[in-house]
Amino acid sequence: MTTSPSSAARKPFNRLLLTGAAGGLGQVLREALQAHANVVRASDISAMAPPAGKHEEVISCNLADKAGVLALANGVDAIVHLGGISTERAFEEILGANISGTFHIYEAARKHGINRVVFASSNHVTGFYPQDQQLDAHSPRRPDCYYGLSKSYGEDLATFYFHRYGIETV
């Protein structure tokens, strides 16, 4: 069996959206995701490096801006959602970036027919357990801060969007 050059170069996605692209993990994934998509659309509210060639787009977006997120997700095949505040802050800050922002990501996915989202959760979802206690998939969540609570909400939102709209989250 032979593989033609065009099929050998085929990538699973035409365009991937990466939120939180200015963060530590986001900066690493900007380059790594290019092996999986023809174009990586990198987004963050913070300043980012310029596009690294024709296979990358850089777009600034505040996840609390519903219309902005809807426009940001237009034309993408899947979303890698790392965006938001990654440390404990005042609830009002967490609300806009992490809770409303994650809702806006899933709504944009639904409205644009995007059926795959990668959502980064956190160990803070189970942070009130003693560190030496073993947990399994059935252990109740016990968020230890507003940030952990926002990630717990994101997990529930992902489950809701799967059952209601068929959007898969990993």
Question: Where does each model-flagged region fall?
Answer:
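Catalytic helix-loop patch of NAD(P)-dependent Rossmann-fold dehydrogenases
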Residues: G96, P130-T169
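NAD(P)H-binding glycine-rich loop region in Rossmannoid oxidoreductase-like domains
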Residues: L63-A97
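Conserved Rossmann-fold NAD(P)-dependent oxidoreductase catalytic core, especially the SDR/UDP-sugar
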Residues: H104-C145
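Rossmann-fold cofactor-recognition segment
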Residues: G53-D65
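SDR active-site strand-loop-helix element
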Residues: T19, S43, I79-L82, V117-N123
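NAD(P)-cofactor binding segment of oxidoreductase domains
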Residues: I79, A90-V117
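Conserved glycine-rich Rossmann-like NAD(P)H-binding loop of the short-chain dehydrogenase/reductase
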Residues: H36-A49
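N-terminal Rossmann NAD(P)H-binding glycine-rich loop of SDR-like oxidoreductase domains
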Residues: P12-H36
